[in-house]
Amino acid sequence: MLSMQACAVSNSKKVFPMSHQAMSDAVLDQLFRQARTVHAFKPEAVSDATIHQLYDLLKWGPTAFNGQPGRYVFVKSAEAKAKLIPALSPGNVPQVESAAVTVIVAYDTRFPEHLPTQFPGYDAKAVFDANPAIVEPAAFRNSSLQGAYLILAARALGLDSGAMSGFNPQAVNDAFFPDGRFKVNFLLNIGVADPAGVYPRAPRLAFEEAAQIL
């Protein structure tokens, strides 16, 4: 996702302090093959310390220019959930009510302001300053990546999750981001799965249907 020039600058200073090896099947099962989208959760809390752990993992995921447009509101209290629920599609209300925490995965429309610190080897901020129309698409795209890293972080810590797009974005923005700087991307419920809220595994496309090697 980086430009070739940016990659050259960043790669010239890279040092990999550790060797890499394939993860075990047990880890791959937990992160991918056996992990499921969850629609109901057990009444088990997720601690604030665990929420900090989630962020401290997801923040290391790669993004363009090392930008960090993702912003996260961890909706945990009854009062905060009551503020969110009116913006939901009716069918999604029980999921939020049962989840230990619902994360509003949002993005910062002014994220390039931080790029001089986050990507000091190249003036990435100037790229966005010269092309303001690309700021919001980049923020949305990279916050989507960061939201996916949050899903993997939750799985890595033994938690379950379920992403949702059934909500009124304007209502969420009005309730939680009234100044307009941050905008919601999607919602993510996190907790411990109730087996009753796990649907049978649906099929995936075969490699030949979705991919090609050129």
What are these regions (language model features)?
Residues 2, 7-214:
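Acidic, surface-exposed loops and disordered segments
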